[in-house]
Amino acid sequence: MKIFLGADHRGFKLKEKIKEWLKAAVDLGNDQFDPDDDFPDYAALVAQKVSRGEGLGIVICGSGGMALVANKFKNVRAVECWHELAAKHAKEHDACNVLMIPADFVIPLQAKKIIKAWLEAKILVDEKHQRRLNKLKQIEERNFI
């Protein structure tokens, strides 16, 4: 499964660290530190890929705005995670396909643990969780044009 990365200036340093751990990840930008860049640009690039079913996404900004942008795309379930247990549950219970890490509040070692937990987690396929995902899909179908 491909993993797409995106970050603004507040997440840039952490994204560069993440690329060292996830060597096969595809970096969609920013490719250089730019204090004037805007988080929606890079969140949208990642979310487009995930929305089309091309892989999973990890977006990094300061405090969570990239998750807001990613969730504007059909088939995207982006969750902001500060802890590995939250990331594990986001994948298992909510089929999270875009992980958002707030670089202002998460150090690189913690980010590595969060990503590892999220990547290793499996989506729960029992009736209860599938029912909830189906309801989410129905809401999405009604509200995304």
PLM ranges: what are they?
Residues K2-I3, G55-V59, V76-V79, C96-M100:
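Structural motif
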Residues F4-K17, E84-I145:
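C-terminal binding/interaction regions
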Residues K15, F39, A43, M66-A67, ...:
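A general structural signal for well-ordered alpha-helical segments in protein cores
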Residues K17-L22, G29-N30, E84:
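Non-catalytic beta/alpha edge segments that cap or flank active sites
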Residues A24-F39:
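A short beta-strand-loop structural module common to alpha/beta enzyme folds
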Residues A25-D27, V76-H83:
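Short hydrophobic/aromatic-enriched beta-strand-loop microsegments
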Residues L45-F73:
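Glycine-rich phosphate-binding loop
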